[in-house]
Amino acid sequence: THRNGHVEAPAHTHSRITIRNKKELEQVHICLGVPSHSLSHEDRYACHILNTILGGGMSSRLFQNIRERQGLVYAIFSGLNSYRDTGCLSIYAGTSLETAEKVVDLVIEEFRNLKKQPVDPEELRRAKDHLKGSLMLSLESTSSRMSNLARQELYFGKYFSLDEMTSKIEEVTADEVQRLAHTFFDTRQIALTVLGNLDGFKITRERLDCN
């Protein structure tokens, strides 16, 4: 809803599987994405916590389980992009052709795990501390503070202090994170793009089943 009361429907796209053979690429580049909430949605802080737990740093599930423990990727992370009317939660992984299918399977497994059971208190605590630390660092410079003020005025018409934002982060519960996982991680909503020297590589929608 805009400030003048006009309501626009959220943008809608089709969730496709795109496979592109690029022989010049040394790695296989994998990107999965699901729709998420808008920048002003009431669950925006829980969205950031979910992203942090999934792939937002070296202590995240994707990094620890797929890169550190199994060594299947060169890099892996998730990111949250939020706009006025919609958003996108995306996961990137760089790997080899031999391990590409396994990496996709393990990402889908993490989707399932986040849906199956609430995050434990220790992991939730780490995610909150990480997110608050990142927020504080992002507002250290004058230019970043001015950008934050402008963004808040554009999207909210008001200013949220650092204390207000950190308090909202603290209010996020494990049940809220699990609820968002159920909302976002729907097999029908997952978009997948794979680029690389793929040599006949194929993947089906059934392989993305996270229910």
Enumerate the language-model features and the residues they cover.
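C-terminal subdomains that position terminal phosphate/3'-OH groups for nucleotidyl transfer/ligation
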Residues: 111
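Charged substrate- and nucleic-acid-binding regions of tRNA-handling and nucleotidyl-transfer enzymes
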Residues: 156, 178-179, 188-195
